[in-house]
Amino acid sequence: MNAPLPQSVARPGTTWENPMGTDGFEFIEYAAPDPKAMGELFERMGFRAIAKHRHKNVLLYRQGGINFILNAEPDSFAQRFARLHGPSICAIAFRVQDAKSAYERAIAQGAWGYAGQAGPGELNIPAIKGIGDSLIYLVDRWRGKNGAQEGDIGNIGFFDVDFEPL
């Protein structure tokens, strides 16, 4: 039996269930053998590089509410993915109300878990294997979650922890 959804997830008039507690996309992660060219493409599409990862060769591009991550970290999952698949989306991140619960439910339903390595001071984000060797991250920390306002205690997102502004 599924628990009732938090108010922020249950939309008026919605008749379907949301057992994973999803609440949108947090980011799409890209990898390419030539990350510079991919970044230039993002800029031509109107995205701006706004932050860099604190410890890795990873940039955050944003346009409105859309977040692209460009991962150029040598010997990372993303770069191994790019060597195998070429320029591509290597991962997506869903916003979920409770990442641990969503991960456990996905595994119970037959998904394959992915054990990544979080570095010092980084969030450990649960992930499952997606289509074509890609990853699906389950993120439960984002700004504005459950209606949080600027300055509210706990209104700290994934990007606030792992990235610093350019």
Locate each region found by the language model.
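An N-terminus-focused feature that recognizes amino-terminal "leader" regions
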Residues: 1-142, 148-164
